[in-house]
Amino acid sequence: SLQLALKMYEVMVRTPHVKHWLPTRMHKFSKYQQVLTRMQALPNVMVRPSSDAIDGTFTAGVHGSTILPEGMTVPAGVKVCTAPTTNGKCSGCRACYSKDVPVVGYIAHGRKMAKVIRIAAMA
């Protein structure tokens, strides 16, 4: 809800010593635009509007994250999340939190995602 987003913004403002990373699909709805813009303007916050795609596609300048099918050639400008190779831990990587990293790609994982990708490939 918008009220929840405003509360999240308040927490971000009150914790300037903490880096916040906000992956979101709410960027598509106009009622959230103002609060997401305010969040992104904070030096300790990285808002990552998520692409809805599961094939690695994204719109440059709009999306901050995308899902990459396993084995896919990584699109230019995408930093691949390394957590799957480090037991699900960031292990010092802070790409998701960095305003210098335009797009983070997350490798698709799990049985449900494999099924979704398989069905999409047949379409």
Residue ranges and their predicted role:
Residues S1-A123:
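Class I S-adenosyl-L-methionine
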